[in-house]
Regions:
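Cross-family detector of peptidyl-prolyl cis-trans isomerase
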Residues: 1-213
Length: 213
C-alpha cells in the first residue's frame, strides 16, 4: 500500500500483507473484494482509492489547495494450486502413484512400506525457497498408508491454509525447507516422524511463503 500523494510505502514494516481466504468483505473489505472478484489467478491489480477529503498536512487548507488523500493498493492474486513444471518422472520415482482430479489427489501404492521418509517432486516450482522460519501457504492432502483413508485435506474447500513451518510434524519440516514455491510434492512419513499410528501419504502444493507471523 502506497500514499497516493507522496508515494510513501504505508505497509507495516514495509512488508506486503498476505491474505489467505475467500475474496469476501471479511477478508478484504467491500471495496477490495469487489475489485478482485472475477479476476484470474496470477493477476496483479493496481487500485487507487480515496481515504478522505482532508487537506494534506503541509498544504494550507483553502478551497483551491484542498486535496483528496488516498492510497494506491497493489494486489497480486496468487495461485491456489501448484504451477510448476511437471517432473520428468511424475510416477515411478517413489512409492506413491498420484492422480490429480478436481476433488483432489488420488493416491495408490504398492505393498512395500518405505523404510524412511520419501519425497517425490510432482511439479517443480520456480519461486523462492522455503526457509526454516517461514510461514507457508499450502494446499495439502493427508491419508493413512494402511487404509488409504483421508485424514485431512484443503482440497475439500479449495481454500489454501497458511501454516507455520515450525509447527508442522517433525518429519515434514526438513523435507519442505529449500523447496521452491510452485512445487507439488508427494511425501511419505513413517509413524515416528508423523502422528505415531501409521505411515502417512501426503500431497502438498507450496503456494507462497512469508516471514513467520
Amino acid at each position: 500500500v502506497f500514499d497516493a500523494r507522496t508515494g510513501e510505502l504505508l505497509s507495516p514494516n514495509g512488508r506486503p500483507r498476505l491474505v489467505v481466504g475467500r475474496a469476501d468483505n471479511d477478508s478484504l473489505g467491500a471495496d477490495l473484494a469487489r475489485e478482485v472478484t472475477g479476476r484470474s489467478e496470477g493477476s496483479r491489480l493496481l487500485i487507487a482509492r480515496p481515504l478522505s477529503s482532508a487537506p494534506a498536512s503541509d498544504v494550507p487548507a483553502t478551497p483551491t489547495t484542498r486535496l483528496n488523500t488516498g492510497e494506491v493498493v497493489v494486489i497480486d492474486i496468487l495461485p491456489t494450486l501448484a504451477s510448476g513444471q511437471a517432473s520428468a518422472q511424475v510416477n515411478g520415482s517413489g512409492p506413491l502413484e498420484v492422480t490429480m482430479r478436481d476433488e483432489g489427489p488420488v493416491i495408490t501404492h504398492g505393498d512395500q512400506l518405505p523404510s524412511g521418509p520419501t519425497v517425490q517432486p510432482l511439479l517443480t516450482g520456480s519461486g523462492g525457497q522455503v526457509r526454516a522460519d517461514d510461514d507457508i501457504v499450502v494446499q495439502y492432502f493427508v491419508s493413512g498408508w494402511s487404509d488409504g483413508i483421508e485424514r485431512e485435506s484443503t482440497w475439500r474447500t479449495g481454500v489454501p491454509e497458511r501454516v507455520r513451518l515450525s509447527e508442522l510434524m517433525p518429519g515434514l519440516r526438513p523435507l519442505l525447507i529449500d523447496q521452491k514455491v510452485g512445487s507439488r510434492l508427494a511425501i511419505t512419513l513413517p509413524p515416528d516422524q508423523a502422528t505415531g499410528d501409521d505411515t502417512l501419504s501426503i500431497i502438498i502444493d507450496i503456494l507462497a511463503t512469508a516471514p513467520a507471523s
